């Protein structure tokens, strides 16, 4: 098993591409002891399963009922909020003394079917004061009412606005938001919209069957069936491919990716990082030993969670330094 910060390669991270199925019953990597109580609590919450599209609205309602109030996040990180139209909230440190060093546009998780602009905004919000970030968090349209094409278009519109004044912009996303960020990053490349970088935290890149998808088929944080149904809803009528299935990755800005060794998306993320390197893209990959999907948002004070936060902080700091050099 890989340790903090190692990129994965070799026989313990085998990716099954295309429509091939995983037929073996691979051994399931262990969740770190310090994270098990949080995972057990997720299981006790009994979020509705997503067996098919008819379960999506029930899942979305349950997700909304469990969501943290926006005021809680703003108070935790001492953030000031200003609305920028109907779909964007701009978060800045309340005592920001000067213009932000870096603008971060954030896309929330929720499987492309649930969530709000504040869900997971700690990803960048926790660093807003220290690193002088301006965080734009987006309420993008959700499936099945909107498809993946519409989501990408909505994000691209915001990114055109965010980059219009020449400010350095990092596009960041967590889980489903990370996958959407990867797709929107490709759209920016094609449209000539310049981004400073992409920060993809445990991104939901595709619905392929991989070893890790089989290992965590029934995971309490996000399982294989839910992933397949969510992607089916998002891709209905959409011309866009999931970013994990795209072959044309050259020309992207620097990319940060991370994943847990004990999560469903692990192998898709590791494979994506390898293909970024093959395409000549500057990519940084971390595989967090014993972490499950989004565990750093559940048990923030765990050693492995603190390591994940520190790695993201370091990468954002590097982006800020590059922007002013």
Predicted features by range, described:
Residues 27, 31, 35, 42-49, ...:
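Alpha/beta-hydrolase superfamily serine-hydrolase fold, recognizing
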């Amino acid at each position: 098993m890989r340790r903090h910060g190692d990129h994965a390669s070799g026989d313990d991270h085998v990716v099954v591409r295309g429509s091939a199925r995983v037929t073996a019953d691979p051994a399931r990597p262990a969740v770190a002891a310090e994270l098990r109580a949080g995972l057990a609590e997720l299981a006790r919450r009994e979020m509705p399963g997503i067996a098919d599209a008819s379960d999506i609205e029930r899942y979305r309602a349950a997700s909304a009922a469990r969501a943290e109030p926006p005021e809680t996040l703003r108070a935790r990180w001492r953030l000031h909020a200003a609305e920028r139209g109907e779909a964007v909230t701009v978060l800045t440190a309340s005592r920001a003394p000067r213009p932000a060093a870096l603008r971060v546009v954030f896309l929330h998780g929720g499987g492309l079917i649930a969530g709000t602009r504040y869900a997971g905004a700690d990803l960048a919000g926790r660093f807003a004061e220290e690193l002088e970030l301006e965080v734009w968090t987006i309420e993008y349209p959700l499936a099945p009412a909107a498809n993946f094409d519409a989501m990408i278009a909505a994000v691209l519109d915001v990114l055109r606005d965010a980059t219009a004044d020449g400010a350095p912009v990092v596009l960041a996303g967590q889980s489903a938001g990370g996958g959407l960020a990867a797709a929107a990053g490709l759209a920016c490349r094609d449209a000539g919209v310049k981004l400073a970088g992409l920060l993809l935290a445990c991104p939901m890149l595709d619905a392929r069957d991989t070893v890790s998808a089989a290992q965590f088929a029934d995971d309490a944080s996000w399982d294989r069936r839910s992933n397949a149904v969510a992607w089916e809803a998002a891709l209905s009528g959409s011309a866009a491919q999931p970013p994990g299935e795209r072959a044309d990755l050259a020309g992207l800005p620097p990319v940060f990716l991370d994943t847990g060794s004990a999560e469903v998306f692990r192998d898709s993320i590791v494979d994506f990082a390898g293909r970024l390197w093959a395409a000549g893209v500057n990519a940084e990959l971390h595989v967090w030993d014993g972490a499950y999907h989004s565990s750093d948002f559940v048990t923030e004070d765990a050693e492995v969670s603190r390591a994940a936060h520190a790695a993201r902080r370091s990468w954002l700091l590097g982006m800020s330094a590059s922007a002013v050099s």
